[in-house]
Curated annotation (Swiss-Prot):
Protein name stated in the entry: Glutathione S-transferase 1-1
InterPro entries hit by this protein: Glutathione-S-Trfase_C-like (IPR010987), Glutathione-S-Trfase_C_sf (IPR036282), Glutathione_S-Trfase (IPR040079), Glutathione_S-Trfase_N (IPR004045), GST_C (IPR004046), Thioredoxin-like_sf (IPR036249)
Membership in a protein family: Belongs to the GST superfamily. Theta family.
Domain GST C-terminal, residue spans: 87-209
Source organism (scientific name): Drosophila simulans
Gene of this entry: GstD1
Length: 209
């Protein structure tokens, strides 16, 4: 069983948990207390010198960056390739959505909310505009689409639903974006591990209360 270093509230960690559920892989979950500096201990730095979560250790093979872990789990353990198809064009669209999630959507969350939550900084209106812009892009991607990349659930949906649900508990109005809202309501029903994802979201919500 693969060791999985994580925090339940972390969106990237939740995307891996849902992907593991989708491919039927059990994870040996190991909570990492970042506030206590457990990620900076020599034994963890030996596993992941970047000292980030999530981190997976599968039979001695260490990997971090949630979207890389998602793809690895599907390629190694998926009974089919439906979550990450081998077709170059289908895979390219999924990759684009994953990179969009990492570099644009979730990045906008971090840039706007993290300074407020962790540094008690005032809200930055310019950073909020970046969130709105990211959601407008996602709304356009989802025009006429039930899923984020193609016509069935993929790792792109799983990564994006982890991010979008985090925006929801932060109080962002997802309903303003009709295509995103419709996709999100469907994703809640069809994504394996949604319940655990939402429990993690509610844990993260405490930072906003």
């Amino acid at each position: 069983m693969a060791d999985f270093y994580y925090l339940p509230g972390s969106s990237p960690c939740r995307s891996v948990i849902m992907t593991a559920k989708a491919v039927g892989v059990e994870l040996n979950k190991k909570l990492l207390n970042l506030q206590a500096g457990e990620h900076l201990k020599p034994e963890f730095l030996k596993i992941n010198p970047q000292h980030t979560i999530p981190t997976l250790v599968d039979n001695g093979f260490a990997l971090w960056e949630s979207r890389a872990i998602q793809v690895y789990l599907v390629e190694k353990y998926g009974k089919t390739d439906s979550l990450y198809p081998k077709c170059p064009k289908k895979r390219a669209v999924i990759n684009q959505r994953l990179y969009f999630d990492m570099g644009t959507l979730y990045q906008s969350f971090a840039n706007y909310y993290y300074p407020q939550v962790f540094a008690k900084a005032p809200a930055d209106p310019e950073a909020f505009k970046k969130i709105e812009s990211a959601f407008e892009f996602l709304n356009t991607f989802l025009e006429g689409q039930e899923y984020a990349a193609g016509d069935s659930l993929t790792v792109a949906d799983i990564a994006l639903v982890a991010s979008v649900s985090t925006f929801e508990v932060a109080g962002f109005e997802i309903s303003k974006y009709a295509n995103v809202n419709k996709w999100y309501e469907n994703a809640k029903k069809v994504t394996p591990g949604w319940e655990e994802n939402w429990a993690g979201c509610l844990e993260f919500k405490k930072y906003f209360e």
